[in-house]
Amino acid sequence: MKKIIGVFSSLLIFGLAAAQARMQNAPPEDELILKARQFLEALNNNDFQAAVRDFDQTMMRVSGPDKLAEFWKQVPGMFGAFKKQAAARREELGPYSIALVTCEFEKVTMDARVVFDKNKKIAGFQFIPSLPPAKYEPPQYANPDFFEEKEIVIGSDDWQLPGTLTIPKGEGPFPALVLVHGSGPNDRDETIGPNKPFKDIAWGLASHNIAVLRYEKRTRVYGPKIMVDKTIAVSFTVKEESVDDAVDAVRLLQATAGIDTKRIFVLGHSLGGMLIPRIAEAGQDLGIAGFIIMAGLTRPLEDAYVKQISYLVSLDGAISEEDKKQIDEAKAQSEKIKALKEADAASEMKILNASPKYWLDLRGYDPAVAALKISRPVLVLQGSRDYQVTTEDFENWKKALRPRENAAFKLYPKLNHLFFEGQGMPTPNEYAQIHGSVAEYVIIDIAAWIKKN
């Protein structure tokens, strides 16, 4: 299986950020499903002019024939050769209609998610894991009798984000934790396949008398707005993607009854962990009590991207010529990022579906070194079986922060990127297609650290 998720899911997806949608069965001859099938057939035939025939203006601008061809070249390395289209279904998302066509590749089955606007033009496209709808199965350590959940909204008028506050029952005040997503248009639960790691953490910690705030990511709720507005698209960086909303979440908790305002913590996972130093800096006047870095990347994103591609194409034990091309393409994209100049900051071009300013903003950013400026306690957590953010990153955090008396480190031998247990070579199957939960001992360690601080 050669599916890339997590750190780079947002960089390899064309089009609209997904949101919670209402699913319904569609008749076989549904017009939009037929359009989606024709689009996929054109892709498979490498007829990219035909593929973009139904693109709306925004998609044509950001993902025209050349960029679509560039994307399609990466697909065999991720999924194997395309075999056939299978079943299809429909979703409705506000003004959009979504056709999902199951596609069988040589090494994995994926759903092609083709988004149509009210004029039946294609407004977005992405591949997502093909999974049957799964009911959330809470981990055994979560006790719903101990807490309640409240719907909240964070952010300004232009960027309001719905979320959930999971708060223990009782008078309080309770310590609280804000959860900050990894990359990609994540929902509040960081849902991937049948799994919801952020919900595991929220329910698990609330069972230990710790309140948890989680929210929809900005790129999930406002994906179309970010794409269509040129000013926003060109200037969009990790500040807008993650940092600002994490700080707003802390402010909301400070104004919430039942919360111990002197004991509000922030946890960042994956990209969120990488950005903890920036969140700490942006919220330095808020008195945040401490920070937790879960599988936080320390290396440049483009370097980790090449490593991920190389790992994924090697999972079957052989490197084919197509695999080599995939690795070479990844290296070429990485080199494009490294070759960017400050003069490119206002350009509308995209590299790995992110603007030059996005990449330039991260140039020279060393999260581990930046973390030295954090005066509050820091806890770094890492799974040894994580191929996306590796023990190399963990050692970088450790090397930089080890002299600090208020820094703590935990390395878990059996855990993957989502802090689920597994054995052998880690693959995306472990969390994209197999039900799992954040390990209970991780919840216990986080709870103990928060209560200690």
Question: Could you tell me what each predicted segment is?
Answer:
Residues 33-34, 49-94:
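Short solvent-exposed beta->alpha transition segments
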Residues 285-373:
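Accessory cap/linker subdomain of secreted extracellular hydrolases
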Residues 132-172:
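N-terminal cap/lid segment of alpha/beta-hydrolase-fold proteins
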Residues 374, 380-382:
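Short beta-strand/loop motif that positions the catalytic acidic residue
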Residues 418, 424-453:
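Catalytic active-site module of serine/aspartate enzymes centered on a nucleophile-bearing elbow/loop
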